[in-house]
Amino acid sequence: MVSIITFTKNVLVTLAFALLAQGLAIPEDIDKRAEKVVSLDFTVTRKPFNATAHGQHHQSQQQQQQQQQQPAQKRGTVQTSLINEGPSYAATITVGSNKQQQTVIVDTGSSDLWVVDSAAVCQVTYPGQSPTFCKQDGTYKPSSSTTSQNLGKAFSIRYEDGSSSQGTVYKDTIGLGGASITNQQFADVTTTSVDQGILGIGFTGDESSPTYDNVPVTLKKQGIINKNAYSLYLNSASASSGTIIFGGVDNAKYTGSLTALPITSSNELRVQLSTINIAGTTVSASTTPVLDSGTTLTYFSQTIADKLAAAVGAKWNSYYQLYTSSCNLAGNIVFNFAKGVTISVPLSEFVLQDGNSCYFGVSRDSATILGDNFLRRAYAVYDLDGNTISLAQVKYTTSSSISTL
């Protein structure tokens, strides 16, 4: 379900005068309501974790990378949500004059929007994968849209996990959250090894082609939101939906106060992490992870990951490319950032179960990433105009108090 919440100052003023004329009280929060925000609900997809598929996938991708000479064009998110590793967070958008529906992963770790063409070839990457796996969440047929514009430019993106997509650059009308943006540039992908389309909402400097206005920038430029900023609420691990609010923040969804941390990269949504407390141990983790909604697990360098795993008695399994662990991890893992910001996550969030075996939700990678198992316990406000990410401990509630950024 998607919704747009749009209140203008003129409407609020008119309503206030109307209430006064009738001798009625003006609600205290009338001037605090969101003026221009787009609220887009996530659909949470749960797929059973499969350690064998994880291991086969990563071995296959490592072989592909050794064979390919072309460097990855982007920061590598090991897109674990794309290989059956638990909940993934996607939203429904429409493309074209005839509103062709797509369900796309909402990804703060990349910047391009791409959708799957109706005639696309899905590249199978592990045994048992359906040959039509990439088309199951909607496709796009440019010729059926009267507003479609083929820009005649090739699109190619390869992630550092080896997954890739190729196609052609288009412009068309995009609908999301009840809002509509025109002449939006995106890619129509005709070959892909990724499960479904991706709505990348990071910095334009992280785009795979020469810089262009991606979706958040266009929302601002076309006057739908005031600022290139959005807030992220993934909700609990058992919830069926979460929400991203473009141009706004839901003040009911966190405890304490939001603290703004400087973004440390010009292209990626990174902040400074200091230490991690786990099982009575303090692990030095002076690094700058990407806060990435498009990645299910959390990734650190081998040095840091090994220390975290050792603290909970987890052992590295080279075949599965994961740490085997107890199925009953207790206590919390606490992430300590700059400015005294702390986010506490139950260790149960970091348990992946495959049958009778369990695995630790932290793994090794050259790219440092705090994925969904972290973000579910944080309320995050990404301000790309102000170059900050504000964090607070999440509060799970159906209440809402939205204000404009």
UniProtKB/Swiss-Prot annotation:
PROSITE patterns membership: ASP_PROTEASE (PS00141), PEPTIDASE_A1 (PS51767)
Residues carrying sugar: 50
Any one GO cellular component localisation term in the record: extracellular region
Region forming the signal peptide: 1-25
Record bears the keyword Signal: yes
An example Gene Ontology molecular-function term: aspartic-type endopeptidase activity
Main location: secreted
Active site: 107, 292
Record-linked InterPro entries: Aspartic_peptidase_A1, Aspartic_peptidase_AS, PEPTIDASE_A1, Peptidase_aspartic_dom_sf, SAP-like
Catalytic activity: Preferential cleavage at the carboxyl of hydrophobic amino acids, but fails to cleave 15-Leu-|-Tyr-16, 16-Tyr-|-Leu-17 and 24-Phe-|-Phe-25 of insulin B chain. Activates trypsinogen, and degrades keratin
Inducers of expression: Expressed in greater amounts in the mature biofilms compared to early biofilms during inflammatory disorder of the palatal mucosa among denture wearers.
Chain sites annotated for binding pepstatin A: 107-109, 292-296
pH dependence: Optimum pH is 2.5 using casein-resorufin as substrate, and 6.0-7.0, the pH of the saliva, for cleavage of Hst 5.
Biased composition, class Low complexity, residue ranges: 58-70
Key word Secreted present: yes
Occurrences of domain Peptidase A1 (ranges): 89-392
Subunit note: Monomer.
Family label: Belongs to the peptidase A1 family.
Protein name stated in the entry: Secreted aspartic protease 8
Naturally occurring in which organism (per UniProt): Candida albicans (Yeast)
Gene label: SAP8
